[in-house]
Amino acid sequence: MTYNTDKSKALFARAVRVMVEGGSSPSRGPANYGEYPLFIDHAQGSRLYDADGHEYIDWMMAYGALPLGHAHPKIAEAITNASHTGTLLAAATEIEIEVAELIQRMVP
């Protein structure tokens, strides 16, 4: 099956004008994807949807970091709630201790 990916191709042409090899990461460049990568518009559960509207199964799931899939409602809600206390804190926080304690309980 061959899909028309003209929008991804156009987005890549735009990207190469402002980013080295058209991406912010070496893994997104043509060395890994051939002529141009697919540009993903959105994701839900185990599915990715490209800029041209095609649906794909996300076999990689962020290299294993998404066991519940993309845009899981409970995860999205937790992220929204957590964002009200700060979006990126490089300082020490209580939640950091709580996560470490949880990991310690789960992995003796």
For every predicted segment, state its role.
Residues 19-20, 50-51, 74-75:
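Short, flexible segments with low predicted structural confidence
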Residues 2-42, 102:
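Active-site-adjacent loop/helix segments that line or gate small-molecule/cofactor pockets in enzymes
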Residues 55-108:
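Glycine-rich loop-to-alpha-helix module at the N-terminal edge of alpha/beta enzyme cores
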